[in-house]
Amino acid sequence: MKFTFSWLRRYLDTDVSLDVIIKKLSDIGIEVNNVDYCEHLKTFVIAEVLEVNPHHSANKLKICKVSDGKQILQVVCGASNVKVGMKSVLACVGSIMPTDQSIIEVVKLRGVESYGMLCSNDELGIVDHRNSKNGIIELPNTYNVGDTFFPCDPIIEVSITPNRGDCLGVYGIARDLAAAGLGKLKCIGELSNHSNCSSPIEVSVQVDGIVKGRYIKGIKNCESPKWLKDYLLVCGINSISFVVDITNYIMLSFNRPLHVYDANKIKNKLIFKKADNQTEFYALNDKKYILGTENIVAVDLENSIHSVAGVIGSKLSSCLLDTEDIFLESAWFAPVDIVLSSKKIKLSTDSSYRFERFVDPRFLQTGLDLATKMILEYCGGTHFDVVSNEVHVVDNIELNFFPDSVRSIGNVNISNEEIFDFLIKLGFIVDNNNEFLWRVTVPSWRSDIKHSSDIVEEVLRLYGYDKICEEPIPISHVDISDDYHDRLKALLLSEGLMEVITWSFTNMVFAEKLGYSSELLLIDNPISDKLNLMRPSLLLNLLQVVYENQAYGSSEIAIFEIGQVYGFNNICGSNSNVVCGVRYGNNLPRNLYKCDRSVDVFDVKSDVISILQELNIESNSIELRKSDKSYLHPVRSADVYFKDICLGYFGELHPNIVHLYEIKRPVVCFEVFLYKIPKVDVAHKELTESCYQSVKRDFAFLIDKDTSVQHLIDVTKNSNPVLIDNVTVFDLYEGNSIGDNKLSVALSVTFNPVDHTLNDQEIKDASDLIINAVAEKLGGVLRSF
């Protein structure tokens, strides 16, 4: 948005310099993009064409003699509308063109030198919706030859955020500056004489909106004064006539879009409604648009379309210099309706840009009166009563506000009196009878103020962000779970797994195939049909990752993820974190030594044991039980228990599930439920190496097949816990030679004495304790063949 310094001072009574205003605008949150002191615009002057002669070697070019008030220059021009006696804009040699930043130089055009360029609207960046024809600018005779065309008044360009539609008018910016202490906001003049004449044109609204209108009869439309043309020119808008220019001026000054119709083209009534599909509309810019039900149109009783409401007017009822009777419209429409309407016809105008960002619904009458007053002053005429129709109801927004919240949230030292003064200057109505709790009514032009925290922000930006006191950030304690996560990630990375992060959603079909219930986990509005369920397990998404990487040619995949699951066993809450891993393919890439092999259940068993040890749970304190999970292999899987608490599982994926995911080779996986891990205190003791020789003995026991090998290890170790240091399995055998329901388990037992070297008898006694314990508790016997 652009405006000049003098334009701002029309509404802001101040004597501060431009530099002070620029700094304050940035301080209060209005970004200043550029300040143009207009030195380069002085080279664009009013020139008169004295002669027009044909070019000797180019039919479309003409050799012109033009006067810039100081000298007569030769200019070669290709415009079809150039003629003797016309006044236009001359870009002198050295001028920088506003649109492409090109520099005007002395050039030869087909052998003839040209000392400047006569300019068109497009070349100067001037928008003229009503004149889309090519040609140089033709100025009225009231312009003086030699005067500068552009106003040499400093131009301020600002960026207005979408929430501050009120600052899309110069008056809104002046209001903020006045509230910040840079002067006093001037009062807006009012229409002094009101009419008692009934309007011959009525309005009817059939959409979400408010429309007010006024009929003015017998005007003498005229050319706009230079000050008005200059203001519009700064914003890139070409002057049309005084009546049209005034509507643009009110819009740019007060963020109040207006539209003016030739009243004689309207049949009795304007009806604002949705357009029919495939309706043709001829706009002011001489273009045809095909309308749809997204567009709001103003039609009369003959169903003639006079405007696409909030966007652009119709060529049918455009206001021209010879127009005598006009109808002024001031309206409010729902921002979303104008967004859709503008997108439908792919046209954005100054008017639609403002409607989309909210305009003040309570300023309709005032904007109408301001335009009426200026039209009567410059063009004469008789005005009639305002007609209106309202479908939208404007409600006041009232908020409870604690003034102390400014001090506590903003960490500033500000008094209640200062807070009150800021709010009043911004247009808020404040009931401060209660010292601690105020009742604040939000002004109608501030649609962005919805909560008391927004009021705090308003006070702070005017008081000054630089006055917020610095305060050190409090040191917060690190969540122990975060520390665990980092440690586990480092551990698994060292084990050769790569971390992945997947969606918190998964595919309901696959979840049900794995046996998870979807009753409580369905998403009402999923981002995809394949992501319609909150994940009950990380395994589901990791298998999808395996499938996708397999499709890209990966033959070895080892991945893990730490994250939350939902609804698992119906006990998961906000801390339902788990760690899940998947291995696929070979344990190592192909190599010279051929030491690679396919991953198996023991790889993921090792992963689980490493994780539990990292969490202070030793391997000798866990118990492996047969898993009943349908998606795991029935004999190559196990659940992991600690003190009768299931901490997770590991195993090979069931072939049916592998086939379901279209994976080509067996997959092994694990999942550890971190939210179930108990806090285990570890007594750190000094590691002392025994100075006495340890003794190893091997035992091969015959036990029933349904007896847990882990149970055998525990019985062996507990038979003499002081002397036995370690028990490991080194062989398993089953076959007809030992019986159908029997299993041979070979154990290696390490005896580690602490105070003397064991003799043969002590070793025999310790061995007998093991054999007797296994026989008594498990019915196992020492294998003798």
Swiss-Prot record:
Keywords: Aminoacyl-tRNA synthetase, ATP-binding, Cytoplasm, Ligase, Magnesium, Metal-binding, Nucleotide-binding, Protein biosynthesis, RNA-binding, tRNA-binding
GO cellular component, one term: phenylalanine-tRNA ligase complex
Co-factor binding details: Binds 2 magnesium ions per tetramer.
Domain FDX-ACB: 690-783
Record SMART domains: B3_4, B5, FDX-ACB
InterPro entries given in the database record: aa-tRNA-synth_II/BPL/LPL, B3/B4_tRNA-bd, DNA-bd_dom_put_sf, Fdx_antiC-bd, Fdx_antiC-bd_sf, NA-bd_OB-fold, Phe-tRNA-ligase_IIc_bsu, Phe-tRNA-ligase_IIc_bsu_bact
Pfam families documented for this protein: B3_4 (PF03483), B5 (PF03484), FDX-ACB (PF03147), tRNA_bind (PF01588), tRNA_synthFbeta (PF17759)
Catalytic activity, EC: 6.1.1.20
Domain tRNA-binding, chain residue ranges per copy: 38-150
Chain sites annotated for binding Mg(2+): 448, 454, 457-458
BP GO annotations: phenylalanyl-tRNA aminoacylation
Reaction(s) catalysed by this chain's protein: tRNA(Phe) + L-phenylalanine + ATP = L-phenylalanyl-tRNA(Phe) + AMP + diphosphate + H(+)
Superkingdom as given in the UniProt entry: Bacteria
Subcellular location: Cytoplasm
Gene3D superfamilies per the UniProt record, alphabetical: 3.30.56.10, Bira Bifunctional Protein, Domain 2, Ferrodoxin-fold anticodon-binding domain, Nucleic acid-binding proteins, Phenylalanyl-trna Synthetase, Chain B, domain 3
Molecular functions per Gene Ontology: ATP binding; magnesium ion binding; phenylalanine-tRNA ligase activity; tRNA binding
Domain B5 positions: 394-470
Cystine connections: none
Cofactors that this protein relies on: Mg(2+)
Subunit structure and binding partners: Tetramer of two alpha and two beta subunits.
Family indicated by similarity: Belongs to the phenylalanyl-tRNA synthetase beta subunit family. Type 1 subfamily.
HAMAP family named among the record's database cross-references: Phe_tRNA_synth_beta1
NCBIfam families registered for this protein in UniProt: pheT_bact, YtpR
Protein name: Phenylalanine--tRNA ligase beta subunit
Source organism: Ehrlichia canis (strain Jake)
Name of encoding gene: pheT
